[in-house]
């Protein structure tokens, strides 16, 4: 895997986690709007392996699930997990960018 593949993979992971965060934000809003006795259909982000033969994670949509009683706490835990995964992909992207820059610098010597 060269540094450009690393950048593509990390960017794909960031795109997937951003889409998951959008779904989770809708869940938080829906759980607050449902009221104490109303239930809402929670959307669960789904991921798949994508790309052209390379290992790349893509957002594959969301599947509806009846509220299991976890409510806002479960949603916030999911938001934290998705946020941390996004940050991890952003860190990998920065490392890949640094490696690409160093490779270009070495080629100039």
Model region roles, listed by residue range:
Residues 1-109:
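Amphipathic alpha-helical polymerization modules
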